[in-house]
């Protein structure tokens, strides 16, 4: 078993100012996205659409607003609506954590639609350009989660080479034991807990870095190297992210205040299913539209 390093959440101390790793990872993610965008400017079919470096800078401004506002509102509405309706001022306490990818995705989509309207472009043309830039930010965000030792995975067999002990999960581990006696006996978890006061868990943040970050990045970047029907790159992002998130959720610990929902699926999985379906529908539409235009 591997023990999580339990990093200091503060990366840099600048006098009274503390720069946290999670915030720093957001910055790294946005910078990486800009770099990817500028690399894509060199592709002939991208250059033919008239994209410029200034467009990327402007899109990132909209993207930051969409990510922060959408991510926070998504967390409030999708995950803890009852609490925040009772404590509305706590919505603004972003330093206490609480961001939702699916909310951030909706926020960024709306922001890109606004950008497209201002630049008189079709919004799918904008999202097709942006989509390959997103996975780098997702990977950076999940790395921030791992450094913070949060959003850990479900309890697993201690003999698994990837099993990890998270100090931040001690309280959850103690509460988990009496609820799962069959697994405690099967995996000899009582002995593990007596020795470490922790239980082995999946490092699901690393799984997300691999699938939502690295694999999705290469899939999108390579797919978008050639000219595709408008909407196809956006569709691949929806399908790819939805499938990656849906898969990883089987190893990720559900939110304790929600648990598992209908059919034994988590909130993250239920929010990912519409993304997958929308992606498939958009992909079919994109290629049928190109075929119809070619036949006309």
Curated annotation (Swiss-Prot):
Matches recorded under Pfam families: LGT
Q: Which residues cross the membrane?
A: 17-37, 59-79, 97-117, 230-250, 257-277
The protein's matches in InterPro entries, at most eight in alphabetical order, are given as: Lgt
Name the residues that bind a 1,2-diacyl-sn-glycero-3-phospho-(1'-sn-glycerol): 142
What does the record give as EC number?
2.5.1.145
Pathway(s) this gene product operates in, as recorded in its UniProt entry: Protein modification; lipoprotein biosynthesis (diacylglyceryl transfer)
Q: What is this protein called?
A: Phosphatidylglycerol--prolipoprotein diacylglyceryl transferase
Catalytic EC class: transferase
Q: Which domain of life is it from?
A: Bacteria
- Please explain the role this protein plays, according to its UniProt record: Catalyzes the transfer of the diacylglyceryl group from phosphatidylglycerol to the sulfhydryl group of the N-terminal cysteine of a prolipoprotein, the first step in the formation of mature lipoproteins.
Q: Which family does it belong to?
A: Belongs to the Lgt family.
Which of UniProt's keywords are assigned here? Answer: Cell inner membrane, Cell membrane, Membrane, Transferase, Transmembrane, Transmembrane helix
Q: How does it sit in the membrane?
A: Multi-pass membrane protein
Gene assigned in the entry: lgt
Molecular function terms from GO? phosphatidylglycerol-prolipoprotein diacylglyceryl transferase activity
The answer to keyword Transmembrane applying to this record is yes
Instruction: State the GO CC annotations.
Output: plasma membrane
Where in the cell?
Cell inner membrane
A biological process from GO: lipoprotein biosynthetic process
């Amino acid at each position: 078993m591997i023990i999580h390093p339990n990093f200091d959440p503060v990366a840099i101390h600048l006098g009274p100012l503390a720069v946290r790793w999670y915030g720093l990872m957001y910055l790294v993610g946005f910078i990486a996205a800009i770099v990817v965008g500028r690399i894509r400017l060199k592709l002939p079919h991208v250059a033919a659409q008239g994209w410029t470096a200034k467009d990327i800078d402007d899109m990132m401004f909209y993207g930051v607003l969409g990510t922060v506002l959408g991510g926070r509102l998504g967390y409030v509405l999708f995950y803890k609506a009852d609490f925040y309706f009772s404590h509305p001022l706590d919505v603004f306490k972003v330093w206490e954590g609480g961001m939702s990818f699916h909310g951030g995705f909706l926020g960024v989509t709306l922001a890109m639609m606004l950008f497209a309207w201002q630049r008189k472009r079709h919004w799918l043309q904008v999202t097709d350009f942006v989509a390959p830039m997103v996975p780098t930010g997702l990977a950076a965000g999940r790395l921030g989660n791992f450094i913070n030792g949060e959003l850990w995975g479900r309890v697993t067999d201690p003999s698994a080479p990837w099993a990890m002990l998270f100090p931040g999960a001690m309280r959850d581990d103690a509460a988990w034991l009496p609820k799962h006696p069959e697994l405690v006996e099967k995996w000899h978890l009582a002995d593990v807990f007596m020795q470490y006061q922790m239980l082995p868990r999946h490092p699901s943040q690393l799984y997300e870095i691999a699938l939502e970050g690295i694999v999705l990045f290469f899939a999108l970047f390579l797919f978008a190297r050639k000219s595709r029907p408008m909407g196809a790159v956006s569709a691949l992002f929806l399908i790819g992210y939805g499938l990656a998130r849906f898969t990883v959720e089987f190893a990720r610990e559900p939110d304790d205040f929600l648990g598992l929902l209908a059919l034994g699926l988590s909130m993250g999985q239920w929010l990912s299913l519409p993304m997958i379906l929308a992606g498939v529908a958009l992909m079919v539409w994109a290629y049928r539209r190109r075929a119809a235009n070619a036949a006309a």
